[in-house]
Structures are given as structure tokens and as C-alpha cells.
Amino acid sequence: MPNTAAYAQSDYQVRLDWGGAGLERLAPAHIVVVVQTLGLTARALSACERGGVLDLAPGAGADLARAAAGAGAHVVVGGLRNAAAVAAHVLDRQRARGERTSISILALGAPEDPGTDATRFAVDDLLGAGAVIAALGDLGIDHASPEAAVAGEGFRALGGAVRHLLTASGAGRALAAEGGRDDVLVAATRNAASVVPVLDGDVFRAA
């Protein structure tokens, strides 16, 4: 699918797409927020909350983050646990730039097959992306594409049920079956983290 005006969402300040293919479809943005609620987001927040850093291990999240940074974007990790902090960070960056700043939200989803760009829809990542979009809207950054607006308003409507939705989702059930139920419950806590992991070279560190 070509990166044309029909798919690039370039008319909008806040954009949403899925995975590495989504990054290629979207118009270049000043800031890219990577969301993988039970994967990269959870690992990056855990490391940064402890005062450490998260090395970029091989995988879809690392590849997407590097590609976004290579295109000149400021890359951060966001989701349910730090949506408000991410929105505040974006607003600070916009104020520092002195002009409207474009934001692409990239939900990673679940890879269908290793080594391909095929992505399976993941409700946990849709919720995380929606949380960030809703938080941006709360700060007046609300010129959102239809794709982003639907995710943000969907989160507003269902945000009170996040714990149930996450634990009952396919990804949540799979992680719980592997002994990670507590990790799912932690990931479902809204705005419990004030840290924003920012890509700095090959690591994510707290902003």
C-alpha cells in the first residue's frame, strides 16, 4: 500500500497505524509513540522505573523504533500505564519547538509470522494507543485522524473496563497461562507510571 495522502494521515496532527508497515504508510512525524502494552511498553517502563535503561533487543518493536528514529522522529514508549505522562511530554516538546508538532501512535500488535510485516490485531495495544490519544486530547492536542479519533474515543468509552478487557484479551490470557497474570494486572493500571521511556541510541531511558 503506497504512502499516499489517502493513507498517510498527513492532514492531522495525531495519527494512528499498526506495526512497521504502518510507520511506512504514515507521513513522517516529529514524535513517534510506540505502544506494545504487554511487551515493549511493559519492559521499558519496568527498566526506567528502576532507574535503568532497556537495550533494544531484536524484534518488531526495536526495528520500528530504529526506523522511526532514522527518519528523524523523537521516539518514546507509551501505553495505559503512562499515557498522561506521555501526553505531558509531547506538550513540552511542542512548546519547546514553538510550533504544532505531529505525533504518530504506532500500535505494534502481534506478528503473524516471524520475519514478516504481517500484524495481528491486539486489543491490548489498541487500548494503550487509545489511552495515549485520549490523554493528548485532554491537553488540547486533539486534531486527530479518524483512525486515531476512534481509538481515543473508544478508550474513553471503555476505559473503566480496562482491567477486565486486558485480562480477558487473547494476549492477556496467553501471558497469564505462562504465569504472567500479575504482569497483565500491572499493565492494566491506568496512569500508574510517571516515567516516559525515550529512545537514546540503542537504549530506552527515562526522559
Model-derived regions: residue spans:
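Residues that scaffold, gate, or flank divalent-cation-dependent active/transport sites
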Residues: 12-31, 37-88
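Long, charged alpha-helical interface segments
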Residues: 59-77, 88, 97-101, 117-207
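Short, structured patches in soluble enzyme cores that scaffold and shape functional sites
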Residues: 79, 105-110
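Short glycine-rich anion-binding loops that position phosphate/pyrophosphate groups of nucleotides
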Residues: 38, 110-111
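Actinobacteria-biased recognition of intrinsically disordered, low-complexity terminal regions
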Residues: 1-12, 207
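Short hydrophobic beta-strand segments
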Residues: 30-35, 102-107
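A short glycine/serine-rich beta->alpha loop
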Residues: 29-31, 114-120
